[in-house]
Structure formats: C-alpha cells, structure tokens
Amino acid sequence: MPKPHVSSAVMTHPVRLAQAQDLATRLRLDGLALDPDPQGQPSALRTALVAWAAVAPGAGHHLVVQDDVDAPAELLEIVGRSAARFPDEALVFYTNWHARNGAAARLAALAGASWVRAVPDEFTPSLALCLPVEGAAAFRAYARDSAERHDDELLSAFFRGRGRMSLLAVPNVVEHIGTTSINDHAAQGIRLAACPTSAADAAPLLDRGRVLEEPGWIPYMRYGEGYVRLVGQENGADGGRGHHRWRDALPATGLTEEAVRAPRIPKDLATEVARTFGDAFAEELWIHCLLLGRQAARAARSLGPLPDGVPPDALERLRHSAVATAGPAGLPPERRPEAGPDEARAMTALAWAGVRAGESVG
C-alpha cells in the first residue's frame, strides 16, 4: 500500500505563535497558518481557510492541526498510512470526550472497531483533520463567503451536503491541551480525547482494524445526565441538535425502563462515586454505561471476525481507555477538576460494571 504525500499546516493565532512553532517542529509539520486578522472578531474559520489553502505541490492529502494539541512524533506516519487505506475519506484523529462523536468513538471501541462514521448532527472535530486535496479545495470554495465563525460546524455542513460524514479514528493519538480558547469554548471546561491511545497501539489498529459505519442509537452524557442520540434524528426540524433524555428515548430504542432497571446498581461502587458527585450522577453514569454496553455488544456482532494483524491486547487497552473517560466526560464542566485519581478510579469501576451489565440487556 503506497503511502501518499501528506502536506500539513498548524492553525494558530499570534498569541500562541511560540506554542505553534514548537508543535510544528516536534511533529515535522510543514508550517504555520496564521490568523489573517488577529485583531478581529475571533474566527476559527478565518484561520482554517488559510490552513486548508497551504497544500504543498504534489500532495494528495492535507493535514490541518490546531495549535492547542499534543501528539506523538509518529503522527504524520499514522496519518499517511490511514490516508493510504482510506484515500477518499475525511479522517479525524481527535474526538472530544464529551461530544456525541466522542460517545460514538467510545461505543466503537467497546465493540472492537478502530474507525467509526461521525454523526451528522454535530460539529466535526477539527483539532487534527486530514482531507484529500480535492476535498480541501472544495471546502475552501464552500466556506469562503460564509458568515460562520466555527470551522467545525461548517465542516459538518459541508460533509452533510456531500452525503458522507468523516471517519473518526477511535484510538486518539492527538490530545487537547489546556482549557483556554481563542474561540470562546473555555466554558466547556476540561476537554480531552475520548479514547487516548499510544502511537504503538494506534498504528496497527488504524492500519487494519474494523470500521463501524452505523452504531445505531448512541448513549451519551452532558452536564451530568444521560441522553440518547437516536437514529435519523438529524432529519428533525432542528437538524437533530436537540437532546433526548434516556427515559424519553427508550421507546425508539426498543427497550423498556423495566429492562434497563433490571440489573441492580452495585451499591458499594455507586456510593464511592456519590461521595464526591452525588447519588443522581452515580445513577446517571450507571444507566449511561449500561446502555453503552448494550449497544456495543450489538455493534460487535455486526462487525465480523477480527482481521489478521490487529493485536487483541491493543484492542483491550483501547476499551479500557474508552471506559476510563466516560465518568469525567459525563460530569458538568465545572465539576471535572474535582475528578482526581481516586474519583476517576471510582467512576471507572462503576462504568465498567454498567457496561458489563448492559451486555446482557435486551
């Protein structure tokens, strides 16, 4: 499989110029894409258009990385091999732990998949995104006259219009750093990867791992409560942006509350979580992970056998990574700093109990 030429750029603002230069040097990226109007109203799209125009002559694909990330030295190698495997796809290498797409990645990890199709009713994670050069040019033409400030929202609109959302790398080798935001996202609190993974594990998974095209309905959490992203909800009047509490969504999932409530929450594990975050959050995390386990078990049955060359131990570490982020990601943003090592261990133990209980539901 010949590796394509992938050019690259780091999106940045003058206030983070040194940080961006260090990132570009460490990762051997081609250069920086500076905000052309740094004194203007904050606009990620304005800088993104510069970044997507920075395609090197002869490149077949172009990678745009934002300046507030960390990644291993192997990033370009991993991206290049992924582009060779999926030459016509938009490939996303970071997924937010608290978003619907993060929940899709978490579900896919538990199912044993290495890639998952992004949902159409949410922004496209754009901290590390690779496009075929034709796609980069088409996006620039599409976005050039837009009044939208957020490139991630416009990318989703662009992909929806083309009838194919991006592919999310389930193992995340790219990590967001810090909570400051030039584009007013700091209120979302600590924002990290859904499934952080080492380059050594990610490389074979992304090279040969399975693709989950349709995960079905997707459980996710926001502000300490459980929700379900329903199949086809993007066709609603609000474009699918509404949020369905898990109880309200059950009829559309084919499950009953009686079935969901049948497994008993482990009191000792719930008490440990509730000690810091309250009984209500402990119960919501339990239900969320139970639904996650149920859907992951269903998805796993649709994936077929594990391909040759996919290390089972790497897949198992990916599963553990996915479950470990479920609790902290599900907390309200203002409570996430309270999740120290002991609290994280307690949430992970309860999350795993929920996932395992859910595997036999429905």
Regions found by a protein language model. Name each.
Residues P2-V65, V69-G362:
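Peripheral/terminal regions associated with large enzymatic or DNA-binding modules
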